[in-house]
Amino acid sequence: MRAEQLPLFPTEGEGEEYVLPPLKTRALTPESSLASAIGGFHDYMVRQDFTHNTIKAFLGDLRLLSRYTGLSKPVQEIGTQTLRDFLTYLRHHRGVPCTPKSYARRVTTLKVFFKWLAQEGVIPSDPAAALIHEPASSPLPQVLYDAQVESLLEVTKDRMEGDKVDARPHLLITLLLHTGLKKEECMNIKLSHIDTSDPPASILYVRYDDPRKRQKERKLRLPPDFAETLSLYLEEYAPKERLFECTPRNLEYVLADVAEEAGIKEGLSFERLRMTSAVRDYRAGTPSDKLREKLGLSKVTWREKEKQIKMLAGPAL
């Protein structure tokens, strides 16, 4: 069953009220097949606002389980030992490499799926609760030090105020440092998404055309000087619809050029600025749930990302 994702910001012609359609999934019982349970789990994930990528990954993992046990296997007959044997099969006997990161996600899938079945009363206990979770840690993201941020902003301000005015570097970098946007989100900004009615408190509406990603839509504050910088930028570049009417590669060149002038030898990327923004917000006392929403991350993705941000923002040991 496919469920429609309600957009955060209604578009023209759309009503403001929206009621979720009733579930069409039949009530599950201990005798229900694994296939039926997976269908019900899909409905649950949609209504819990799991991201499209998370839903796709979890369903892929459960398809592997169904191939191993059989689609018609009653869920009450899938015990802890069956799940352990399945994980051993994935690691050593499937014939396809299973990276630590993939293995860790598949354990997470089993835990989330069977915990849901137990909480719904479909099965008496959770067979995945005893599985040992071995999370695959990603390397700590690179962030800018405070001195590097200062050097970067000095360069962008000089370019904006020099003989040959170029406001784009300052607009781009202050935007990313303040909002923590992804590259895709940055490229999708339309001029109509920016509200400068109150210049010192300008607002950006992060929107998605893809209905599957509309749970990521959000309303973000912009830097106090954004409206002034935007005015200079619009006069210089005169974009018609989107804020940045160029290729992503073009903006990457802008970041690389400014980083070189600022003496940042490791270079500069959208992701590095995004993580720098997150660390600075965390240090400033932004609550964890608000920071997750600001970054547009799912609860599953946030588990590891929060640990990394907390470590980078905290004091040295």
Residue ranges of each PLM-predicted region?
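Short basic/aromatic active-site micro-motif
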Residues: A167-R168, T247-P248, K265-G285, L295-T301
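Basic, Lys/Arg- and aromatic-enriched nucleic-acid-binding interface segment
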Residues: S151-K183
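Conserved tyrosine-mediated DNA breakage-rejoining catalytic core shared by Y-recombinases
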Residues: N188-F226
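Active-site/catalytic core of tyrosine-dependent DNA strand-transfer enzymes
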Residues: R221-K265, S277
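Alpha-helix N-cap/helix-start motif at helix boundaries, enriched for small hydrophobics
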Residues: I55, L110, L172-I173, G180, ...
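Catalytic-site neighborhood detector that most strongly recognizes the C-terminal catalytic loop/helix
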Residues: V143, L295-L317
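N-terminal core-binding DNA-recognition domain of tyrosine recombinases/integrases
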Residues: P21-A27, G39-L140, R159
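DNA breakage-rejoining catalytic core of tyrosine-based enzymes
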Residues: I123, A136-L153, K213-P224, P239
